[in-house]
């Protein structure tokens, strides 16, 4: 249904996919790519990055590359688990020639996120997860945020998109687009 909705609206999307799903249902990859969409990595089993080592993550990147014929250039951490303890992921992504990440939530929540973070795409590094690093080689697309009753929160997906009124998410999309930023939405 998502593919059909995107086709109807003449737009494309990036699908951050868990590798084991593509192993079990390889036709999903074909459908995504045949319709002009992008495939990106979301780990092999939806593991929190804190549960992985760099070596295990590198193996997962290789496995995903085999499954997708090297189509993936982007990554999003499950449960937005990129943090100072898992910053090694940035180097692993660069080692495997990834171009971008979209794991940073630019507002602190009880579960994840960062305060004092860039809102626009920026160059991320393992030493700077929240601010542009001119020497960084990986582009970060932070998650979309917005205000609800004066409180800043993620508005692009998950619990928040189910909890917040639709107009709150639509306003966030509009605000991001006014600043020429991509509205990073997840379902």
Region annotations inferred by a language model:
Residues 77-181, 185:
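Active-site-adjacent pocket scaffolds in enzyme catalytic domains
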Residues 1-4:
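N-terminal regions that are enriched for targeting/export leaders
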């Amino acid at each position: 249904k998502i593919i059909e909705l995107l086709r109807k609206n003449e737009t494309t999307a990036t699908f951050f996919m868990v590798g084991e799903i593509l192993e079990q249902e390889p036709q999903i990859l074909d459908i995504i790519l045949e319709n002009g969409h992008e495939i990106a990595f979301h780990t092999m089993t939806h593991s929190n990055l804190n549960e992985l080592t760099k070596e295990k993550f590198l193996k997962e990147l290789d496995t995903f590359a085999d499954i997708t014929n090297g189509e993936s250039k982007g990554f999003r951490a499950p449960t937005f688990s990129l943090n100072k303890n898992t910053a090694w992921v940035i180097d692993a992504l660069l080692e495997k020639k990834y171009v971008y990440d979209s794991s940073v939530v630019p507002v602190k929540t009880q579960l994840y996120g960062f305060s004092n973070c860039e809102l626009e795409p920026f160059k991320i590094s393992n030493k700077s997860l929240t601010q542009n690093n001119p020497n960084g080689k990986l582009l970060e697309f932070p998650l979309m945020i917005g205000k609800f009753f004066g409180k800043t929160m993620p508005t692009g997906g998950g619990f928040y998109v189910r909890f917040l009124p639709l107009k709150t998410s639509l306003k966030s999309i509009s605000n991001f687009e006014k600043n020429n930023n991509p509205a990073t939405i997840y379902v």
